Swiss-Prot record:
Complex formation: F-type ATPases have 2 components, F(1) - the catalytic core - and F(0) - the membrane proton channel. F(1) has five subunits: alpha(3), beta(3), gamma(1), delta(1), epsilon(1). F(0) has three main subunits: a(1), b(2) and c(10-14). The alpha and beta chains form an alternating ring which encloses part of the gamma chain. F(1) is attached to F(0) by a central stalk formed by the gamma and epsilon chains, while a peripheral stalk is formed by the delta and b chains.
Main location: membrane
TM region positions: 18-38
Alphabetical UniProt keywords: ATP synthesis, Cell inner membrane, Cell membrane, CF(0), Hydrogen ion transport, Ion transport, Membrane, Transmembrane, Transmembrane helix, Transport
Lipid bilayer topology: Single-pass membrane protein
Protein name: ATP synthase subunit b
Pfam families xrefs: ATP-synt_B
Superkingdom, taxonomy of origin: Bacteria
Family statement: Belongs to the ATPase B chain family.
């Protein structure tokens, strides 16, 4: 009886059903080893994969924001170039009108006919120049949109993809 009381007094885990300390220590060591093994073989690789994924997502967001900034810049440049082309066309029209007025004073009938031809040619030239500027800007815009799409998606675009993106970008500019 004394041995039983002495064993219980010495073993603080007896109320929990642990009567011998050897299995408890063995289980504790096995648990600690399992935690260490899982940490290095499972948790660390999973954490590394999650960290790499988070970094890729951040890089993708940065590229998207940069693409949006570039797109806004291209739109602004396109608008400025169109305004400039319109001003140049208007200057040419104004110059043609002034030339027509001088010719009108010198030769009434023939000057009138020549002035109309000059005005018509100036308008056609202005429209042609403006159209060329628009086409060049559309092509440049399409290329930048394709480049931005390639950066955002992170893959090389095929020629068909680039043509489709160019068409969509040009259609969005026209509307």
């Amino acid at each position: 009886m004394l041995n039983l009381i002495a064993d219980q007094a010495w073993n603080p885990f007896a109320p929990f059903g642990v009567t011998s300390w050897e299995p408890f220590v063995a289980n504790l060591i096995a648990f600690i080893l399992m935690v260490v093994i899982l940490r290095y073989l499972a948790f660390k690789p999973i954490q590394n994969v999650l960290e790499k994924r988070r970094q890729r997502i951040e890089e993708g967001e940065e590229m998207r924001e940069e693409s949006e900034r570039q797109l806004a810049s291209v739109k602004e440049q396109t608008h400025e170039m169109l305004v400039e082309a319109g001003e140049k066309g208007q200057e040419k029209i104004d110059a043609a009108k002034a030339a027509a007025a001088r010719l009108l004073e010198e030769q009434e009938a023939e000057a009138s006919r020549k002035a109309e031809e000059i005005i018509k040619k100036a308008r056609q030239l202005a429209e042609l120049e403006q159209q060329k500027e628009r086409e060049a800007l559309k092509e440049q815009f399409g290329q930048l949109v394709a480049l931005a799409a390639a950066q955002v998606t992170g893959k090389m675009l095929t020629e068909e993809d680039q043509r489709r993106i160019n068409r969509e970008a040009i259609d969005s500019l026209d509307s």
